[in-house]
Amino acid sequence: MPAYIVLDSQDPPPLVDFYCQMQDVEVLLSYDDGRYTALGANREGLMIVLQRVPEAKTGKNRAHFDLVVDELDGPTEKALALGATWLEPGQTQELMGFQWRCMADPEGNEFCLYLMAAGMNNDAPLPH
């Protein structure tokens, strides 16, 4: 069953580019002159929808993305080059062998770059 998570944005095109490049996904649909843009690998799973809104983000997100990566340094450099911010520069969090870095996209929405513990696969539950 398809599912959407909607992320508000004052200026969706830069975030569309950011998340497409970070997740190696593509624009699946865009309508109402770009007010809504859905991103994903296909239309079957979870898709991110960027929704244009007039107001800027205020406060911490109540939910965030964990982008699962094979290693942390390359994706961190890529995210920074695409306009992300490392929220705790130089800090890597760790719990039970899992590691993550807290980041923010170009509009300040929090996400984590997440490295699975050795021997775990992408289906394992996340500890944070």
Where are these regions (language model features)?
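C-terminal "cap" of GNAT-fold acetyltransferases
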Residues: D33-L46
